[in-house]
Amino acid sequence: MPEDSNKASNTARVVFYTSILTGGILSSFYVYSRYFRRFTCTAEVPKKIYRGRTLFGRVTSVGDGDNFHFYHTPGGRLAGWGWLRPYPETNKRGLGKETLHIRLYGVDAPERPHFGRQGQPYGDEALEWLRSYILGRNVRVKLFSPDQYGRIVGGAKVWKLTGRKDVSTEMLKNGWGVKYEGKMGAEFNGKGKLFQKLEDHARKKKIGMFQQKGKIVTPGQYKKDE
């Protein structure tokens, strides 16, 4: 009888410690997948985290006036980024395969030359403004939806001396774009009216792309004529 009692006691201990170990493994996997898994392309981002999560990382390249490439650094400095693990170089060749392509929500910048077609006035200036504002900076991106080009429509926020700034909002304030006119993939995060007011104000002040004389063709109108 004592031997049977010892066996039962040992079995109970094994079950107890196995349960603890299993629970620890499952908890670790959950924490990793939610907070420390690094996403390298749109296809890797689970649909369930759109509109509910933000991602932190470094802007590694800006190729147009309303989109950029973003190197996801989950956990930020707490996970060693910037001191134990180096940030990637900006504009590094081949890094595109390791980054998320972010399309700024709610805005449209002047088109630059492509496919042999002449670009719009102030397209290069809009690109330079965005580069100077976020290239090489850490940003936090709220994910809204993937678009038809494999990008992620998202809202980016960056810290400046005067506080955290929404990049789409600042772009419109400075006149380097218009409120997004398309119907497909339109995202405003509840700021549609504000964005229209900011565009109208920039037009009135004739700043940014609105410095040009004569009729102003918006990016949406320009793309319709392609």
Curated annotation (Swiss-Prot):
A single cellular component GO annotation: mitochondrion
Give the SUPFAM superfamilies listed for this entry: Staphylococcal nuclease
Q: Which residues bind Ca(2+)?
A: 108
Query: Where is it predominantly found?
Result: mitochondrion
What does the sequence similarity comment in the record state about its family? Belongs to the LCL3 family.
The Swiss-Prot or TrEMBL record annotates one GO molecular function as: metal ion binding
Keywords tagged on the record:
Calcium, Endonuclease, Hydrolase, Membrane, Metal-binding, Mitochondrion, Nuclease, Transmembrane, Transmembrane helix
Enzyme nomenclature, EC number: 3.1.-.-
The TNase-like domain extends over 53-212
Q: Where in the cell is it found?
A: Mitochondrion; Membrane
Q: What is this protein called?
A: Probable endonuclease LCL3
Gene3D superfamilies, alphabetically?
2.40.50.90
The membrane-spanning stretches of this chain are 15-32
Pfam families linked = SNase (PF00565)
Report disulfide bridges, numbered on this chain. none
Question: How does this protein sit in the membrane?
Answer: Single-pass membrane protein
